[in-house]
């Protein structure tokens, strides 16, 4: 879609494109998302995220030192009022290979889910199954989804708050049957940057409320919490994502991730690290059978002056 932009807006658009492209490139490199000869099935929903993902991947395709194919795929789930002409017209204008799949999952969901209940879970499973199957049919080696960093962090808190799990969306995922590899190239990109970029680019956004499903109130509440943090505590969101990349199982409580049961100490281990740097040599002169109050600062200083110095007991504990 053509958008008339001021010189300032053009500059801003180019700056955002460079930023997002850099983040996508780093994510691809960090997780080995794209390899020589890959055929990437880029899943388009008609939303800002998938449009931006396709746009950036096409740009990187021209710059990358490796060769890979991009095939855009949209699943038309026959939701009432879905503008079927929008995506084909846009993709034709780009000259990119694409497929529009038609499958009436909308009717299946309406038949299975009682009126008033959320349809998202079943709808998502049906959509995923169709896309996974089609990826194998066309020989796609990777399936690219448009989830960004905010989605990943929101999912972590949703699972922590409502499912009791430390689980998010991995940037790269092997399907349960091992047949499909899912990648999320926008894993390092912020939603606010993507939204601004999509507006400046004039992507033909298709509204996401066509199914008439209820808003996911849990996700909305988590998003609101994170947005508030982002305003009140700049840098906190970045810190959370960095923490997700720097986990330490031995410092946690998950027995499945670390073998706490088999932990044993080595009584003959040499002193090193924090222990070696402390004043513990003063303990060499302590009579541990004596319940006393010991001035370690004075003891350490005295020991350095006179190695034979004995520690004076400041006070004695009497039960």
From Swiss-Prot:
Compartmental location: Cytoplasm
Coiled coil: none
Motif (PP-loop motif): 45-50
Swiss-Prot/TrEMBL cofactor(s): Mg(2+); [4Fe-4S] cluster
Cellular component GO terms held in the UniProt record: cytoplasm
Chain sites annotated for binding [4Fe-4S] cluster: 120, 123, 211
Keywords: 4Fe-4S, ATP-binding, Cytoplasm, Iron, Iron-sulfur, Magnesium, Metal-binding, Nucleotide-binding, RNA-binding, Transferase, tRNA processing, tRNA-binding
GO molecular function terms attached to this record: 4 iron, 4 sulfur cluster binding; ATP binding; magnesium ion binding; sulfurtransferase activity; tRNA binding
GO BP terms in the entry: tRNA thio-modification
tRNA processing is among the record's keywords: yes
Cofactor note: Binds 1 [4Fe-4S] cluster per subunit. The cluster is chelated by three Cys residues, the fourth Fe has a free coordination site that may bind a sulfur atom transferred from the persulfide of IscS.
Function summary: Catalyzes the ATP-dependent 2-thiolation of cytidine in position 32 of tRNA, to form 2-thiocytidine (s(2)C32). The sulfur atoms are provided by the cysteine/cysteine desulfurase (IscS) system.
Family affiliation: Belongs to the TtcA family.
Matching HAMAP family: TtcA
Protein name: tRNA-cytidine(32) 2-sulfurtransferase
Native source species: Shewanella woodyi (strain ATCC 51908 / MS32)
């Amino acid at each position: 879609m053509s958008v008339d932009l001021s010189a300032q807006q053009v500059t801003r658009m180019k700056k955002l494109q460079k930023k997002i492209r850099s983040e996508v490139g780093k994510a691809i490199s960090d997780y080995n998302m794209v390899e020589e000869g890959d055929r990437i099935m880029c899943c388009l929903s008609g939303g800002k995220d998938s449009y931006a993902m396709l746009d950036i991947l096409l740009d990187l395709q021209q710059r990358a030192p490796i060769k890979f194919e991009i095939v855009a795929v949209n699943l038309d789930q026959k939701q009432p009022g879905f503008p079927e002409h929008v995506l084909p017209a846009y993709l034709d204008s780009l000259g990119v290979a694409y497929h529009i799949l038609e499958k009436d999952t909308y009717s299946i969901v309406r038949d299975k889910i009682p009126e008033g209940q959320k349809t998202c879970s079943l709808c998502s499973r049906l959509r995923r199954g169709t896309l996974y199957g089609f990826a194998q049919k066309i020989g796609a080696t990777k399936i690219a989804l448009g989830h960004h960093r905010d989605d990943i962090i929101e999912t972590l808190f949703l699972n922590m708050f409502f499912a009791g799990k430390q689980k998010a969306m991995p940037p790269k995922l092997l399907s349960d049957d091992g047949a499909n590899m899912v990648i999320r190239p926008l894993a390092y990109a912020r939603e606010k940057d993507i939204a601004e970029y999509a507006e400046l680019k004039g992507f033909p956004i298709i509204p996401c409320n066509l199914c008439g499903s209820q808003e996911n109130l849990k996700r909305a509440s988590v998003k609101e919490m994170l947005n508030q943090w982002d305003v009140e505590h700049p840098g906190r969101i970045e810190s959370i994502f960095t923490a997700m990349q720097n986990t330490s199982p031995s410092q946690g409580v998950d027995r499945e991730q670390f073998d706490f049961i088999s932990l044993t100490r080595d009584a003959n281990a040499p002193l090193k690290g924090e222990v070696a740097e402390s004043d513990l040599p003063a303990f060499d002169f302590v009579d541990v059978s004596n319940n006393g109050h010991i001035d370690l600062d004075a003891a350490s200083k005295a020991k350095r002056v006179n190695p034979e110095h004995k520690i004076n007991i400041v006070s004695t504990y009497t039960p």
